[in-house]
Each structure stands twice: as C-alpha cells, then as structure tokens.
C-alpha cells in the first residue's frame, strides 16, 4: 500500500536566488522547493550549469505569473576565451577549432557594433528549444544537427569591459530569448578567431533589486538558525520572498471595487473606470489593493480575467 503523498505549504511569492556554478537550474529549484516545503515551484528561464546569478524562483500561486518574467529583459556579465571554438559555445564543451587571435581594437569595436540593437540570432544546437517534439540538445548529443530558424532579439546595450590576451569581458543587456553563448560564438566567427564562454553571470532580471538575491547557503543557514531558536523555519525564510505579482510589475494596475471583483474572480469581464484602452493589466481589489490576478482589456473596454489567484484559507 502506497503512502499518502505529503502536501507542502501553500506559500506564495518569488525568491531571487543567486544560482551557484555547476548546478542545473532544475536541481537548484528542487532544493529551494524542499527548503521552503512548498507545494509548487517553478523557475523563470533556465541558466546553464556554468552560469551563476539571478534565478527568480516562483512558489505557489506565483508560478501562474512566471511567464511575465520569461518575457522580460535581462543583463549579463560574460567572459569569453578567444581563439577556441567549442561544440557547446562554452567551457563545458569540446574544443572543435583553434585559431590565432589577430584582430585590432578597431576591428573588435566594429564587430561589437553589429550585435547592438534589433538583430536575428540562430539558437545553438545546445539549447532547450524544441524541434519535432524533442529538445535541440538531445539531437546535438547524438551528433545530429537540425534546421533552426533565426529569431529576432534586441541587444539594448553591449558594453566593452576589457580585452586582455585571449580574454574578452562584456556586459549585455538584452531581450527575452537571447542566447549569450551564441552571441559569443558569432562574435568569435566575425573576428576570425573563434570564441567560447568561460564565465557567465546573470546580473538582473526585469527590475528586480540585486540586493534581494540570496544564496542556497544562506537559506540553509536560516533553517539551522530556526532549529536552534526553536521557531518554524518559515519565520526566517518567508520574509525573503518578493510579492507573488512581482513578475508582472511592468503592467499597469486596475483596482476593482469589491462589488465588481466578485464577478471578475468568477471568470466574468467587468467594466471599471481608469482602465487603459488595451493590453494586459494587474488587477487588485478593495481599498487595500489586494492582488487577485491578471486581466486583459477586451474589445468592449471591459477587464476580462486571464489568470486568477486561488484564495487559500489563512
């Protein structure tokens, strides 16, 4: 007879984890889920095992709104090894080509300029994008290359930090769907020497504050402190969470009176004053502006529910 499945806590919010190097995003996610004893958890855009930095982890009802973070812009610091190209475009891969590094400062500046603004990027075979139902990296590991279409991305800012010997350091502020490994690989080809990523750190996601990032070690320390103090771990862990609607913080807010919000929460579009003419909105209710979900302005100017918060008993 199987044991009943243990139910986790109904905890809702977003943890800004400083992902350590060498772990997959999913491994980190599962550790955080266990530490918080959360019944649901999901991350908002994977980081490669080699990469470190900001990985927002959504707990509970916040998972419903993680898509809005996937769509947000991000900022990275990257160090590239020049003169070597690898099959994965990073240091975890096998070197497939070595060439001398002979470009000038002017050639580097000219090459960097071609990656700024609206550009198209062909994703790496070592990515989680899917082709005919399978992830690209699954084909790549079998030595199979499949066709990939170029995708539009925007590089808002590409800052040159330093070039010393065979190392090049850059900072990149980019749109969703941008592969930093691919930018480095393409840059290496444009410079005629090849390149791959040796260090990658995600500095920011959307407008989340950098000083709210926490490490796995810090979470584990808090759990140990709670045990020593004889208090629930949640008492020390939960204050670290950002609000559950923070993934959608870029969207305008529409506040509904309680007389209207009851219909909205039952799945019905409602009319209200002060709403924008179109687009997605964060919806709150009452004088305390309690977040109740995401809505969208329909053709009649009403706020139609798109994703609703399930209200759990206190």
UniProtKB/Swiss-Prot annotation:
Alphabetically ordered keywords of this record:
Isomerase, tRNA processing
Q: What class of enzyme is it?
A: isomerase
User: Which of this chain's residues are annotated to bind substrate?
Assistant: 43, 76, 179, 200
So what does this thing catalyse?
Answer: uridine(55) in tRNA = pseudouridine(55) in tRNA
From the Swiss-Prot or TrEMBL record, what is one GO molecular function term?
Answer: RNA binding
Keyword Amino-acid biosynthesis in the entry? The reply is: no
Biological process terms in GO annotation: mRNA pseudouridine synthesis; tRNA pseudouridine synthesis
Active-site residues annotated for this sequence: 48 (nucleophile)
- Role summary: Responsible for synthesis of pseudouridine from uracil-55 in the psi GC loop of transfer RNAs.
Q: Which family does it belong to?
A: Belongs to the pseudouridine synthase TruB family. Type 1 subfamily.
State the name under which the record lists this protein: tRNA pseudouridine synthase B
Q: Which organism is it from?
A: Salmonella typhi
């Amino acid at each position: 007879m199987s044991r009943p499945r243990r139910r986790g806590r109904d905890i809702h919010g977003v943890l800004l984890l400083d992902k350590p190097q060498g772990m997959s995003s999913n491994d980190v996610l599962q550790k955080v889920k266990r530490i918080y004893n959360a019944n649901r958890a999901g991350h908002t855009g994977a980081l490669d095992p080699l990469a470190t930095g900001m990985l927002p982890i959504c707990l509970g009802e916040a998972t419903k709104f993680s898509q809005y973070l996937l769509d947000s812009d991000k900022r990275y610091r990257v160090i590239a090894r020049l003169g070597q190209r690898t099959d994965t475009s990073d240091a975890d891969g096998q070197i497939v080509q070595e060439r001398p590094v002979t470009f000038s400062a002017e050639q580097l500046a000219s090459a960097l300029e071609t990656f700024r603004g609206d550009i198209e990027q062909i994703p790496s075979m070592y990515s989680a994008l899917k082709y005919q139902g399978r992830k690209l990296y699954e084909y790549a590991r079998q030595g199979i290359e499949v066709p990939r279409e170029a995708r539009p991305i925007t590089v808002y800012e590409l800052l040159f930090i330093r070039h010393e010997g065979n190392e090049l350091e850059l900072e990149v502020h980019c749109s969703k769907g941008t592969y930093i490994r691919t930018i480095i690989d393409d840059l290496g080809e444009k410079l005629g020497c090849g390149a791959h990523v040796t260090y990658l750190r995600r500095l920011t996601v959307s407008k989340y504050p950098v000083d709210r990032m926490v490490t796995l070690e810090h979470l584990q320390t808090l759990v140990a402190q709670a045990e020593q103090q004889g208090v629930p771990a949640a008492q020390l862990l939960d204050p670290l969470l950002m609000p559950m609607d923070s993934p959608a913080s870029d969207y305008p807010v529409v506040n509904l009176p309680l007389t209207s919000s009851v219909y909205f929460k039952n799945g019905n579009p409602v009319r209200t004053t002060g709403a924008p003419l179109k687009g997605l909105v964060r919806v709150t209710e009452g004088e305390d502006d309690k977040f109740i979900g995401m809505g969208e302005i329909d053709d009649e100017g009403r706020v139609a529910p798109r994703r609703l918060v399930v209200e759990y008993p206190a």
